[in-house]
């Protein structure tokens, strides 16, 4: 089956892209059916790489993030980047950074119009040793819901300023809009944990996917039933292949992982891998992108893939277009995922 699988992000031109997004969300995006005069404050389409405003008219600030669907509402969590982007004097590589502000949260019924719910996991300003102090690094927050405990569990990559800590941080909340209470950090399975995501399978089991061993190997770790720590069962994948920014989804009983190479803030080639089981053997299909700038993933990096609830076989792949010298102004590239017959991704130059 591997050679016949396709992950298609098919965009022929910008106007058609808007129509595809509208089509995927039709039946979800009621605003698209309203007269123009009634939707003056609403977004009716998303253009990749352009500023995307929330319902207050401010640019959405949720970088490196992911979505959670709960009780009819989508929640978007991401790095809330504010303030000046700097390159530390001691830096030996382009580790541009902003001070940690926290994890921002937005809510939406239609995936187009997002209400800012606030900073649900804020920085801890009065303790320089805390993982969430502004001087540290907080990246790739993802939230999952535990049906057994009724808790919302956030996993994130937490770091020292020089990226030597390489830990996972966990926080818990009773509500999807927080506040999240920080539980601490650790190296899952005694291994480095940097770019990461979490995924809940149909049976309720949750997994963390994380770049480890100095970003050379992708670990997949089964979590405990409460989703708060590793169970001790894990696999090592893509050894010495240096993959990061994992985004995982399930289609037709198979598991897919979208990832990027490791080139700091600079874009690189994407890869799709597929497996029959999460803890089984992963087979790399190759670069899903075709067309202009395919070898740069259209100047973006994967972060999450979200099923569109209520739409059969409809998925949206989320990417960040990083601006390394102005990280707050990094933009979003969302693309529809269609599963048909070939493996490619097409998008015009933006």
Report the location of each language-model feature:
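Beta-propeller blade signature
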Residues: 103-108, 169-175, 272-277, 334-339
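Structural motif
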Residues: 164-169, 216-221, 266-272, 327, ...
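Loop/turn-rich, solvent-exposed surfaces of beta-rich toroidal or solenoidal domains
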Residues: 243-282
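Bacterial Sec-dependent N-terminal signal peptides
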Residues: 1-41
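Blade-edge beta-strand/turn elements of extracellular beta-propeller
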Residues: 42-56, 114-129, 174-189, 222-241, ...
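Hydrophobic core segments of beta-strands in well-ordered, beta-rich domains
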Residues: 63-90, 117-120, 132-134, 139-161, ...
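Beta-propeller domains
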Residues: 78-115
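Conserved small/polar residues in nucleotide/adenosyl-binding loops
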Residues: 343-349
């Amino acid at each position: 089956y591997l050679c016949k699988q396709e992950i298609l992000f098919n965009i022929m031109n910008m106007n058609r892209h808007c129509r595809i997004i509208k089509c995927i969300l039709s039946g979800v995006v009621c605003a698209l059916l309203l007269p123009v005069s009634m939707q003056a404050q609403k977004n009716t389409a998303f253009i990749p790489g352009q500023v995307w405003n929330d319902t207050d008219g401010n640019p959405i600030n949720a970088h490196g993030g992911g979505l959670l669907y709960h009780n009819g509402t989508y929640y978007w969590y991401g790095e809330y980047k504010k303030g000046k982007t700097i390159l530390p004097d001691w830096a030996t590589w382009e580790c541009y950074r902003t001070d940690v502000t926290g994890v921002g949260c937005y809510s939406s019924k239609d995936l187009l119009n997002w209400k800012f719910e606030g900073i649900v996991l804020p920085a801890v300003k009065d303790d320089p040793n805390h993982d969430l102090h502004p001087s540290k690094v907080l990246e790739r927050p993802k939230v999952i819901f535990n049906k057994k405990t009724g808790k919302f569990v956030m996993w994130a990559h937490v770091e020292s300023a020089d990226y030597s800590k390489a830990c996972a941080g966990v926080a818990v909340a009773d509500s999807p809009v927080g506040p999240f209470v920080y539980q601490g950090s650790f190296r899952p399975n005694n291994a480095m944990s940097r770019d990461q995501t979490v995924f809940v399978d149909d049976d309720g089991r949750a997994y963390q996917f994380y770049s480890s061993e100095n970003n050379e190997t992708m670990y997949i770790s089964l979590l405990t039933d409460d989703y708060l720590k590793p169970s001790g069962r894990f696999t090592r994948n893509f050894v010495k292949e240096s993959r990061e920014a994992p985004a995982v989804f399930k289609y037709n009983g198979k598991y897919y992982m979208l990832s990027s190479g490791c080139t700091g803030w600079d874009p690189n080639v994407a890869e799709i891998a597929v497996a029959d089981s999460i803890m089984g053997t992963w087979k790399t299909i190759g670069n899903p992108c075709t067309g202009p700038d395919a070898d740069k993933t259209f100047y973006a990096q994967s972060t999450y893939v979200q099923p569109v609830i209520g739409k059969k076989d409809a998925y949206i792949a989320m990417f960040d277009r990083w601006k390394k010298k102005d990280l707050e102004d990094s933009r979003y590239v969302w693309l529809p995922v269609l599963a048909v017959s070939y493996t490619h991704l097409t998008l015009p130059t933006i």
